[in-house]
């Protein structure tokens, strides 16, 4: 509790993905005042041509707090 799921285009190396995960975890620790073992983070790479069917169609607009040019 909670789990953060990141979906993004391919191309980042493992070190960058690890840094993304650690930064997200650290911010949640700070914001929620909870220890690291409360949070899990996954990163899934999605090809641009599969983005709409894999990501955009699955995101519930009521759950979307920040939009982007790709997911609105």
Give the predicted meaning of each segment.
Residues 2-72:
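A domain-level signal for the structural core that forms small-molecule/cofactor-binding pockets
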């Amino acid at each position: 509790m909670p789990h953060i799921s990141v979906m993004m285009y391919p191309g980042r190396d493992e070190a960058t993905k690890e840094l993304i995960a650690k930064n997200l975890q650290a911010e949640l620790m700070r914001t929620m005042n909870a220890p690291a073992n409360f949070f899990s983070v996954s990163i899934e790479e999605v090809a641009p041509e599969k983005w709409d069917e894999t990501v955009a169609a699955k995101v519930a607009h009521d759950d979307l707090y920040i939009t982007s040019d790709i997911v609105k």
